[in-house]
From Swiss-Prot:
<dbReference type="GO" id="GO:0005737">
    <property type="term" value="C:cytoplasm"/>
</dbReference>
<dbReference type="Pfam" id="PF04376">
    <property type="entry name" value="ATE_N"/>
</dbReference>
<keyword id="KW-0963">Cytoplasm</keyword>
<dbReference type="GO" id="GO:0008914">
    <property type="term" value="F:leucyl-tRNA--protein transferase activity"/>
</dbReference>
<comment type="function">
    <text>Functions in the N-end rule pathway of protein degradation where it conjugates Leu from its aminoacyl-tRNA to the N-termini of proteins containing an N-terminal aspartate or glutamate.</text>
</comment>
<keyword id="KW-0808">Transferase</keyword>
<dbReference type="Pfam" id="PF04377">
    <property type="entry name" value="ATE_C"/>
</dbReference>
<dbReference type="InterPro" id="IPR007472">
    <property type="entry name" value="N-end_Aminoacyl_Trfase_C"/>
</dbReference>
<dbReference type="InterPro" id="IPR016181">
    <property type="entry name" value="Acyl_CoA_acyltransferase"/>
</dbReference>
<comment type="similarity">
    <text>Belongs to the R-transferase family. Bpt subfamily.</text>
</comment>
<keyword id="KW-0012">Acyltransferase</keyword>
<dbReference type="InterPro" id="IPR007471">
    <property type="entry name" value="N-end_Aminoacyl_Trfase_N"/>
</dbReference>
<dbReference type="InterPro" id="IPR017138">
    <property type="entry name" value="Asp_Glu_LeuTrfase"/>
</dbReference>
<dbReference type="InterPro" id="IPR030700">
    <property type="entry name" value="N-end_Aminoacyl_Trfase"/>
</dbReference>
<dbReference type="GO" id="GO:0071596">
    <property type="term" value="P:ubiquitin-dependent protein catabolic process via the N-end rule pathway"/>
</dbReference>
<protein>
    <recommendedName>
        <fullName>Aspartate/glutamate leucyltransferase</fullName>
        <ecNumber>2.3.2.29</ecNumber>
    </recommendedName>
</protein>
<dbReference type="GO" id="GO:0004057">
    <property type="term" value="F:arginyl-tRNA--protein transferase activity"/>
</dbReference>
């Protein structure tokens, strides 16, 4: 482990929760002057931290613990029947790793995705500046995985490649291709990629029991949840 005790953290003032509107949220951030070291990041991911843009953070709410960090142990994952169908349905896609960059092709897909799937969220309306600040960061461990069908961009999975696993930062995809279940396929592909690179887990961010948008995360079994500072397996 790195010397985490030497790190500084800052908590925000309470603000509206983007997942549970009736709750007030507080977020704990790693000191932004701290260099984004991949080993520090990996250790903090074990403690439930996530990356957004140039910041590492985790919920630090006074009266709520609904946001539960979740990860899939890659070597123990077994796809169910529906997931095997999704893998088969998308076997015609090719996946290529690219460095983070702003491209109109990326942004147009991102824009359509946000406008179609998340028009009620705090990322709407999408803008080029928002896209760049959120996703296009010059970090050596960050990758854009492009999913293409005969050259056509179908999805982009933004991932951080850490010593202890793949951290799924964000995925956006073609909103008119419901039959393919591209979001779910991207997670299945990341599990396969983690195995290929001998990585322990795929970090999915936070699972919230009472948030329907988060339900998909517990469809991948077994899954591990960080409860009382311990990773607990949910089979």
């Amino acid at each position: 482990m790195t010397e985490l005790a030497r790190l500084k953290f800052y908590a925000t003032q309470p603000h509206s929760c983007s997942y549970l509107p009736e709750e007030q949220a507080t977020t704990l951030f790693l000191d932004p002057s701290q260099p984004m070291d991949v080993h520090v990041y990996a250790d903090l991911s074990e403690m439930g931290f996530r990356r957004s843009g140039d910041h590492l953070y985790r919920p630090h709410c006074q009266n709520c613990n609904a946001c539960v960090p979740a990860r899939i142990p890659a070597a123990r994952f077994i796809p169910n029947r529906q997931q095997r169908r999704i893998l088969k349905r998308n076997a015609d896609l090719t996946v290529t790793a690219a460095r983070p960059a702003f491209k109109e092709e990326y942004f147009e897909l991102y824009r359509r995705y946000i406008e179609t799937r998340h028009a009620d969220g705090d990322m709407y309306p999408p803008s080029r500046d928002q896209f760049s600040t959120f996703l296009v960061r010059d970090l050596p461990f960050c990758w854009f995985y492009e999913f293409r069908l005969e050259g056509r961009l179908m999805a982009v999975a933004v991932c951080d490649l850490l010593p202890n696993g793949l951290s799924a930062v964000y995925t956006f995809y073609e909103p008119d291709e419901d039959r393919r279940s591209l979001g779910r396929f991207a997670i299945l592909w990341q599990i396969t990629e983690a195995l290929r690179q001998n990585l322990e887990a795929v970090y999915l961010g936070y699972w919230i029991k009472n948030c329907k948008k988060m339900n998909y995360k517990t469809q991948y079994r077994p899954i591990e949840l960080l409860i009382n500072q311990r990773w607990v397996t949910l089979n």
